[in-house]
Amino acid sequence: MKVGILGGTFDPIHFGHIRPAQEVKQQLNLDEVWLMPNHIPPHKQSTHVSCEDRLAMAQLVSDELPQFKVCDIEAKRDSPSYSAMTLAQLREIHPQHEFYFIMGMDSFLNISKWYEWQKLFSLCHIVVCKRPGWQLDSNDPIQTTLKPRRKLATQATDGTAGNIFILNVAEQDISSTQVRQQLMQGHIPSAALPASIQDYIQHNRLYRGNSATNSD
């Protein structure tokens, strides 16, 4: 089974997360996409609502979208959510699966700063979402990692891990910070949030009086 992995704090989950994942699923013909909320994200000090609420919102999205599932492996962990550790655990649990780890171009350009980042290439394929027309600098140091591993979406993979796909996805001008700020001001950003997420946030009175300084 070909499974896309989309991790994040999802604080809250919004169309800026969902729509690129749908495009990746279609372009790479994935069987499923797993939404994986972080419990303790390594690059952020905290989240704004509980892990339970963020899991519940991800579950609402998966309930509405066929082939979207929630993976709670990081949510159950009481230590920072390092991707290499998570993918190693997933490969152990699901050795028959072929994992595609989805990230934005900004994350990919900083991947060499990640914990044991080189292990990722033995555990999964990397999918990098970029804006149409955006080009990676030919002199960027990441090119030494990218060039021998890059594949087009239409090309077959070399085994179950180790390839990198750079995919054009439609630009989504949405950030969790902006969504939280609007919610704190009493506005419901209906263009950014599925109706079920809007209802959940209102019913549970989330994002009221919290700081909204972190990004996605």
Swiss-Prot record:
Q: Which domain of life is it from?
A: Bacteria
One molecular function GO term is: ATP binding
Q: In which pathway does it act?
A: Cofactor biosynthesis; NAD(+) biosynthesis; deamido-NAD(+) from nicotinate D-ribonucleotide: step 1/1
Question: What catalytic activity does the UniProt entry give for this protein?
Answer: nicotinate beta-D-ribonucleotide + ATP + H(+) = deamido-NAD(+) + diphosphate
EC number(s): the record gives: 2.7.7.18
What are the GO BP annotations of this UniProt entry?
A: NAD biosynthetic process
Q: List the disulfide bonds.
A: none
Sorted UniProt keywords: ATP-binding, NAD, Nucleotide-binding, Nucleotidyltransferase, Pyridine nucleotide biosynthesis, Transferase
Q: Which InterPro entries would you find in this protein's record?
A: Cyt_trans-like, NadD/NMNAT, Rossmann-like_a/b/a_fold
What does it do? Catalyzes the reversible adenylation of nicotinate mononucleotide (NaMN) to nicotinic acid adenine dinucleotide (NaAD).
The UniProt entry's sequence similarity note says: Belongs to the NadD family.
Q: What is this protein called?
A: Probable nicotinate-nucleotide adenylyltransferase
Species for this entry = Shewanella halifaxensis (strain HAW-EB4)
